[in-house]
Amino acid sequence: MEYSQSSMYSSPSSWSSSQESLLWNESCFLDQSSEPQAFFCPNYDYSDDFFSFESPEMMIKEEIQNGDVSNSEEEEKVGIDEERSYRGVRKRPWGKFAAEIRDSTRNGIRVWLGTFDKAEEAALAYDQAAFATKGSLATLNFPVEVVRESLKKMENVNLHDGGSPVMALKRKHSLRNRPRGKKRSSSSSSSSSNSSSCSSSSSTSSTSRSSSKQSVVKQESGTLVVFEDLGAEYLEQLLMSSC
């Protein structure tokens, strides 16, 4: 079957009535509902029209904003942890932490337990004293199990000798630096003994020098005169010993 070029490019007037009715279907025109009129076709899929696509710049900006929010929240949490305060602990101006408690066995007098390098150490010292006096009724900074185990590990501490447990713990904490003090006192005593021995030896040597010096004896008109040559070295020794 052959088609002529004229038949392929025929005018629209030569279309059949069925083709015209298909193109000009009334259902594809305006919606007849009471809503504002808009172009509507029942066979068209409008699902894609409800999705909005953002540009890459907008997506990056939102991610940066979300990251800044999360970072600020983390910084706030870290600041809260660093500024945490413990019961019975006070920070000293030079950076140390002091622990103190009111001794209920001594009419509530305030007792200074000691100074510590870390706030946690001072808080544990307070918990030990509070638990030793009040038991499970005490308000602690750390769990009861932790405080009980720390008391068991402490040596040479008798909390039940009839006195105040708070004072016993205070004496224990004050003994932490005692070995250093003993070492210093022993070193100072040894240095003083060394200095005294040096001074005694210098004095004996000076006397021996003076005794070994020859004396000049001169007799004039029945009078005996003795002259001793002290020397410059003996004079310097006397000046040093007098200072």
Swiss-Prot record:
GO molecular function, a single term: transcription cis-regulatory region binding
Record keyword Nucleus present: yes
GO cellular component: nucleus
InterPro entries: AP2/ERF_dom, AP2/ERF_dom_sf, DNA-bd_dom_sf, ERF_plant
Places the protein is found: Nucleus
GO biological process: defense response; ethylene-activated signaling pathway
Record-stated family: Belongs to the AP2/ERF transcription factor family. ERF subfamily.
Protein name: Ethylene-responsive transcription factor 15
